[in-house]
Amino acid sequence: MLQTLKNAWKIPELRKKLLFTLFILLIYRLGSVIPVPFIDVTTLANYFDSVLSSTILGLYNAMSGSAFSRATVLALGIQPYINASIIIQLLTVAIPALERLAKDGGEDGKKKIERITRYTTVGLGLLMGWAYYMMLHNYSSQGYSIITTDGFLPALVIVLAFTAGSALVMWLGEQITEFGIGNGISMILFANIISSIPGMIGTLVTLVWWQIIIVLVGIVALVLFIVFINDAERRIPIQYAKRVVGRKVYGGQNTNLPIKVAMSGVMPVIFAQSICSLPATICAFTGKTSGWWYDHVWSSSSWVYAVIYFIMIFFFSWFYSTIQYDTVEISNNLKSNGGFIPGFRPGKPTADFIQKVINKIIVFGSVYLGIVALLPIIAGNLMEGVKNLAIGGTSVIIVVGVALETVKALEAQMLMRHYKGFLD
């Protein structure tokens, strides 16, 4: 990985992209320390110190790079964009017009879907900004005095500041995707989690020595396991029939169709977490973080939450896999190019076989993601001190996954540059 970064730095084009990505992330981090007006940051910090470790807000805070607990302009982070992406992608399957736009619209259709996602992000940012303001207002009425000035105008300024921040995060992510390295939103999320590590270390050192050893060994084992699964793939053998065109013979070679075990990446975990944490987030925003339903169903440390979380991960893994792999299209492409899978006729039998393989991989990949994501919940229920750690299986999956994807993107661009040099 370090060697890849070193080699990429020597290439002027990639060096510019790396510097641009770092520049955008720097802008994001600067925005993460600019507080919105009419909020007492000191009182807010005292309040969050008492609730972050015991509610879902601690996870939100880690995902936002601690901007959430400081009520900064970028406090909402990437959450509105992620929720908007979930809504639009589900509607794309449910509404035929959107499905046609996504599949048959080409580049224009893709741009229209992106534009709809942007508008939805702003709408959700406005809604979540209002919810965050109401949470601060509710706790201000309980004696915390977080909001320094009451009234319609201060409320409007606070909500619009949060909304503008969510739109800015979306725009920064798009700039990284277009002009930088890797997926912009993933890079921002990666930077947020990395920036939360010092605070996690501070919490870690408060544990008993044997708990520290277990946590460190667990994280290392988790990283190695994630790296192994990310590189694992099922290869379906493909043969091409020989074709004679004039005096030349084409085809006849053997190749394979690689299907990655972790084909859907980290998105099922991120989406499942957004959906499952919604009730607990509403409870946290309204201040109702107690009671039977919250403790036994909505709380992220409950077993019911763990089961629902696992089911949602399985659903989104299947959902993303169906979007990524159109087995009928793959079968038709093989048939038109003279390719076939040994033992299966071209057409429907080939499509059915590929779908059968993908279904098996989806089950394994979903179980893998579910186990990794649920390990922190299980560890937190077995060891009380570990529950206060903001880092979890989701965070480790995101950090490792984004790092591997970034390295692969750099390697692909370096390889492309070598091909360009050869052709030139």
Labelled PLM ranges:
Residues 1-424:
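N-terminal cationic and glycine-rich segments that engage phosphates or anionic surfaces
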